[in-house]
A protein has these predicted regions:
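Alpha-helical transmembrane segments and their membrane-interface anchoring/capping motifs
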Residues: 1-83, 133, 281, 321
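Short, surface-exposed interaction patches in beta-rich subdomains
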Residues: 200-201, 206-207, 216-321
Length: 321
């Protein structure tokens, strides 16, 4: 063995022994309690006190009626859920500076405008998440830690009455997920730069849905003349009802769509994927393969002359059934 190799092995072994010694000292000195009580990513030994002091929370608050949405959030999740009654409500929790309200909202001319006030405590940095060590080094399991860490997420939740029609929904999220349950939008312009879109029982009659980095999952969706664009992420739609011409464009990601029976009977299809396969289960149409360009297509005419689903995927599989 070369002298250099022996030297490096000796140094490595010495560091291992030092690490084991420090671990033993920390363990016998009550280190497990520190790990249990501390956010390892911030190394905050004052348990939750500092985290709580740097957050602003608005409890569920009634707001006047409105017909349109104009939302711009750079670092927050957004939830739209069903109200327990005929009134609308808002609640949120956000990181903040100097305990000031980091979010502003107002209603003018029937439009609810919601935006960050410029004093959020959000910061942007490269983060290596070592918080999983809490489960290994203390009695706290992963599920408990996940529930606890969710207390520190930035979020805004709107509660809307069932069957409320939002005439216009203009929504932008920079870094955050968007969850919708039981919502109806007449015109939409929704854009997510980095986050997932998850909707359960959504109606969108016209407009645009744009996703840069994140998956889109729609359950019981009704779409009209909609343009959906996804740059990097998968698209999953279950029980899709079409009432117009819906166009979907994906750069990188797979598409899986399940149609309801009424849509299957009348809809036309124009499907194409450049690097992937097309599966059209139970649908009648013409399927082609251009081996030179590696392009798969599936086409069929609309039975009612107005309902059509067009999907163009640059790199990904398409499944429609």
């Amino acid at each position: 063995m070369k002298k250099t190799t022996r030297t490096l092995l000796g140094i490595g072994g010495a560091f291992c022994l030092i690490g084991a010694l420090l671990f033993g000292i920390g363990f016998t000195s009550g280190g497990t309690k520190y790990v249990h009580d501390t956010n390892l990513n911030s190394m905050n030994a004052q348990e939750d006190n500092k985290e709580s002091a740097n957050r602003f929370t608005l409890k569920k608050t009634e707001i006047p009626d409105f017909t349109s949405l104009n939302i711009n959030l750079e670092d927050s999740d957004l939830n739209i859920e069903e109200s327990p009654n005929e009134k609308s409500y808002i609640e949120y929790a956000q990181a903040t500076k100097d305990k000031k309200n980091p979010v502003s909202y107002s209603i003018e001319n029937g439009t609810l405008t919601l935006k960050e006030a410029g004093n959020t405590g959000a910061s942007y940095y490269i983060n290596v998440d070592i918080s999983f060590l809490q489960a290994a080094l203390s009695s706290k399991n992963i599920e408990d830690y996940t529930k606890e860490s969710s207390k520190y997420e930035n979020y805004v939740t709107l509660y809307l009455p069932k069957d409320k029609l939002v005439s216009s929904a203009k929504i932008y999220l920079g870094y955050g997920d968007f969850y919708v349950k039981n919502a109806t939008f007449d015109t939409t312009n929704i854009k997510l730069d980095d986050g997932d879109f998850d909707a359960n029982t959504l109606t969108a009659n016209s407009g645009k849905l744009t996703f840069s980095y994140g998956d889109c999952d729609l359950q019981k969706a009704s779409l009209g003349n909609i343009s959906l664009t996804s740059k990097d992420g998968d698209l999953t739609v279950n029980e899709l009802t079409l009432s117009g011409k819906t166009k979907i464009a994906l750069s990188y990601g797979d598409t899986e769509i399940t149609l309801n029976d009424s849509t299957k009977k009348v809809s036309g299809f124009d499907l194409a994927t450049h690097y992937g396969t097309i599966t059209a289960s139970g649908l009648n149409g013409n399927k082609t393969l251009n081996e030179d360009d590696d392009v798969n297509t599936f086409q069929s005419d609309s039975k009612d002359g107005k309902t059509k689903l067009a999907i163009d995927s640059k790199d990904g599989d398409i499944t429609v059934k």
